[in-house]
């Protein structure tokens, strides 16, 4: 385990450092402690000492038996010792109960969780199906609030589509194992609904998409590119780096694409957005994305369990590292009408509504496509605020 971490972790750690951490953890236990418990303590100490908010140690024999265990459907990280929600998964108990991107979970079942690792915090959230977990949440600009959230099995609908006139809308909520296959199915359905005609444009909505399988994001980017670099992953050593290029051809034959993103679009979602933006294949509308541009790898080691830690960073086709930077939109649509990030900008209050949810961001996206995808024409067409 020590050797694996020393060789693969994204930041340099010596074998000696890790061995010292391991030894100090073992010395805290009394004589006669079982070897397996000492091994768990040593591994846990090393993982914590990495300072990697995404690092976890999963002890296989600690997995609960006899009960069906479930979570609530959130992607989260540890930030300054606090559990921060990247985004609730679409259709999850967390989303239905009112958990929002950016929420800070400060208590779980009335117990403070400051300083816990990501795994320790998530283990407290998980529990038997049919039970409830009480979250105390700090939300920006609001008082702390308590949210009871049921633990339940749920299924994320990875891809769905709709038509707004001759504009095709594709929602990608998460990158699961079938996302690319579901995209191809959606494109086929759109073609059938259009009677073989070509849509005037495609809107790909990755708002509140916390990521998922990187390989699926690469496949989706490849589906809209004729050629060009999609993403590169860089490890600590040159031999761990890899470049991914488009090769399958553009499934929509050059039709215009607009991507909707927000501050909860993360990881794999950012790979898709950056690849299409940097290859000048899509216009990005919304806000700066989350900025999770790192890859975690799982390393199983027999009956003891598995560890997961950061091994690579993403590099976009433009040579930018996404991590802690995010993908910048071409058109900023938020609550502030002042231009930011060097991009065109408008207040979301100026956007028309669209769909049953009266979605203003989507309304702006439809308007942009209808105005010939010209930023100037789009901004001129927006109604002025009183």
Please report, for each region that a protein language model flagged, where it lies by residue:
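C-terminal "post-core" interaction segments
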Residues: 160-386
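A short glycine-leucine-enriched loop at secondary-structure breakpoints
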Residues: 93-104, 126-128, 195-196, 275
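Conserved PDZ fold ligand-binding element
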Residues: 1, 5-7, 94-117, 203-205
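Terminal peptide-recognition signature
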Residues: 1, 42, 46, 74, ...
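Amphipathic alpha-helical segments that form the core helices of the histone-fold
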Residues: 19-34, 43-47
């Amino acid at each position: 385990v020590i050797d694996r971490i020393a060789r693969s972790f994204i930041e340099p750690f010596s074998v000696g450092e890790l061995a010292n951490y391991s030894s100090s953890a073992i010395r805290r236990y009394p004589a006669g402690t079982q070897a397996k418990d000492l091994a768990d303590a040593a591994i846990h100490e090393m993982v914590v000492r990495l300072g990697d908010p995404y690092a976890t140690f999963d002890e296989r024999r600690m997995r609960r038996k006899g009960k069906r265990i479930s979570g609530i459907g959130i992607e989260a990280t540890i930030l300054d010792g606090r559990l921060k929600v990247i985004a609730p998964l679409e259709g999850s108990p967390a989303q239905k109960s009112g958990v929002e991107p950016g929420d800070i979970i400060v208590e779980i079942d009335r117990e403070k969780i400051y300083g816990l690792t990501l795994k320790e915090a998530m283990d407290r959230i998980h529990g038997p199906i049919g039970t409830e977990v009480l979250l105390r949440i700090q939300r920006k600009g609001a008082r702390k609030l308590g949210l009871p959230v049921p633990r339940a099995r749920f299924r994320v609908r990875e891809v769905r589509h709709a038509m707004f006139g001759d504009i095709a809308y594709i929602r990608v909520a998460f990158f699961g194992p079938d996302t690319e296959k579901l995209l191809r199915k959606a494109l086929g359905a759109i073609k059938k609904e259009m009677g073989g005609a070509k849509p005037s444009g495609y809107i790909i909505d990755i708002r509140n998409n916390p990521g998922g399988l990187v390989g699926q994001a690469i496949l989706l980017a490849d589906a809209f590119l004729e050629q060009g670099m999609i993403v590169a992953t860089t490890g600590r050593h040159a031999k761990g780096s890899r470049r991914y290029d488009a090769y399958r051809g553009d499934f929509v034959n050059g039709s215009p694409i607009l991507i909707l993103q927000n501050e909860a679009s993360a990881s794999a979602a950012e790979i898709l957005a950056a690849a299409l933006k940097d290859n000048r294949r899509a216009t990005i509308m919304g806000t700066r994305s989350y900025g999770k541009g790192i890859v975690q790898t799982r390393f199983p080691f027999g009956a003891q369990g598995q560890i997961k830690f950061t091994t690579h960073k993403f590099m976009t086709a433009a040579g930018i590292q996404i991590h802690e930077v995010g993908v910048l939109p071409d058109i900023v649509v938020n609550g502030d009408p002042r231009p930011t990030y060097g991009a065109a900008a408008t207040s979301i209050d100026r956007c028309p509504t669209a769909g049953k949810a009266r979605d203003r961001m989507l309304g702006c996206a439809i308007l942009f496509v209808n105005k010939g995808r010209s930023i100037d024409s789009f901004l001129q067409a927006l109604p002025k605020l009183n």
